[in-house]
Amino acid sequence: MEKYIQRIIDIHSRLKSKSLFLFGPRQTGKSSLIANQIQDDVKLSWSLLNARTRRRCQADPGVLRDEIETRGIRDGLVIIDEIQKVPELLDEVHLLIEETDIRFLLTGSSARRLKEQGVNLLGGRAGKMNLHPFVWPEIRELHPTLDKILKYGMIPAV
């Protein structure tokens, strides 16, 4: 496994009091960032890349509430990775934010795509952050050459 490169963006402090959308292009490291910055306080974590989880949520978005109630979760952090795959879950998230002290971290590749679909973006109940490809201070110690940067860009997966 490759070494994790510490990112400048700090999602942990933003999640102390409010839910958060974390948007960014594919392969910019959203899932890796979460795995490396958010360890404590996570009560439930779903990836909608998991076909079984995605199909259950598409068939009945209420399974999110059922899972939270079954586990007795009333506060803490719930992570839903790739929320754009089942945007119908956002209505459940909205209600759960209103009814509980749960904070949500929702990742996706495109806020624009969600807006175009006319889905609930939680009306101010969640902050928004964008994760971009690496910036120079994050990779300076790796001593990348200008040639490599121009050839491959600064996306973590490359």
Name every feature range the model reports, one short phrase each:
Residues 1-158:
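Phosphate-binding site recognition
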